[in-house]
Amino acid sequence: MFSPDGGLPAAPFGLLPDGGPPFPRGGYDGAAAQQLFFPFASEPDGARDAATARAWLPPPAGPPAKAEARPARPCRQGSPEPRAAPPATPCCGPAWAAPPWPGPAPPAATAVPGPPFPGPAAAAFPAAPGHALCPAALQPSSGGLANLGSSGSSSGAASEGGHSSDSGDEDAPTSEELEQFAKDLKHKRIMLGFTQADVGLALGTLYGKMFSQTTICRFEALQLSFKNMCKLKPLLQRWLNEAENTDNMQEMCNAEQVLAQARKRKRRTSIETNVKGTLESFFRKCVKPSPQEISQIAEDLNLDKDVVRVWFCNRRQKGKRLLLPFGNESEGVMYDMNQSLVPPGLPIPVTSQGYSLAPSPPVYMPPFHKAEMFPPPLQPGISMNNSSH
């Protein structure tokens, strides 16, 4: 039953001894102790390799240094207790099951800290405490997608079929309608005898918004943007209706055109001849009078100061154009326009009375550039003919 040394009784090879007391509970009748462990699966003797050792699973050593990417596994709700194998004979070694302590969880099975999506969908997929959230729970239900799709399609259909909030009461015209209206406008405008400028002035007279001839021309040529043509079409349509039903539209356009030209151009100032002579005498005395002198001249001649000032400006420009400047330094001397341009350093040929002299030899001068501040000194003339004196 037990060894004389007082130790535990010997156990067969590959079996652990019983964890109970060394003496059986039934007494000292020498009955064999009952096996308290779960039975293990058996393997045939020929299939067991004695050289292959079954090692224990290592204890958990904290989180792994580098997590390996593993494919997602289906969620299983299993029991943490080891499963029991069918009864087997005690002649072979045990096949160790999973250890009772929990091992490190794979990275793909970690629980999400918050709900995957807010709203009622999160309440439809509650995460059980202590278990990882299954990947299937992260996918929205087909009913939710169908609802979203149906709502989006219904809203799109409503926006296409109905009117938008900022579209206005009437629909925007299409490109074909704008093109046809531009053709009709041009044809009726020519038939009624209006120009493009008349149309722009009439729009300003009737509706307070004037347009240029270029704008009307671009509208008829379809060269404006679609948005601008849509804005301009109602005004032109109203003008066209007024022009067809009103007889004095041409007179109204002509009056507006006259007023516009009067606003743009000032009346031309006319100065009498005797006043011009007086101004000319003042100009010979002083080319550029001061503001005080201009005021005095205007008061003497009963003219406006701006008229006198503009006359002096125009007179100075006229003198520059005709090269007839009058000033203190010129003292009324006019320049001779027919005087030959001869450099002052060269001798001027003198014609003798009664007989002719030989022509002077040609003189070649070095080129003088405009960028130079001082001209180069004159070189002595080189005669091209051998004239004896």
From Swiss-Prot:
Any GO molecular function: DNA-binding transcription factor activity, RNA polymerase II-specific
Database matches in InterPro entries: HD, Homeobox_CS, Homeodomain-like_sf, Lambda_DNA-bd_dom_sf, POU, POU_dom, POU_domain_TF
Localization: Nucleus
Alphabetical list of SMART domains matching this protein: HOX (SM00389), POU (SM00352)
Family annotation (CDD domains): homeodomain (cd00086)
SUPFAM superfamilies: Homeodomain-like, lambda repressor-like DNA-binding domains
GO terms classed as biological process: positive regulation of stem cell population maintenance; regulation of transcription by RNA polymerase II
Biased composition (Acidic residues): 167-177
Region (Disordered), start-end ranges: 1-88, 145-177
Low complexity: bias regions: 1-18, 145-165
Domain of life: Eukaryota
Keyword Transcription carried by entry: yes
Keywords: Activator, DNA-binding, Homeobox, Nucleus, Transcription, Transcription regulation
Any one Gene Ontology cellular component term annotated for this protein: nucleoplasm
Induction per the UniProt record: Strongly down-regulated during embryonic stem cell differentiation induced either by retinoic acid treatment, or by cell adhesion prevention leading to embryoid body formation.
Ranges where the POU-specific domain occurs: 170-244
Function field: Required for the maintenance of pluripotency and self-renewal of embryonic stem cells. Transcriptional activator that binds the DNA consensus sequence 5'-ATGCAAAT-3'.
Family: Belongs to the POU transcription factor family.
Name of protein: POU domain, class 5, transcription factor 3
Name of the gene encoding the protein in the UniProt record: POU5F3
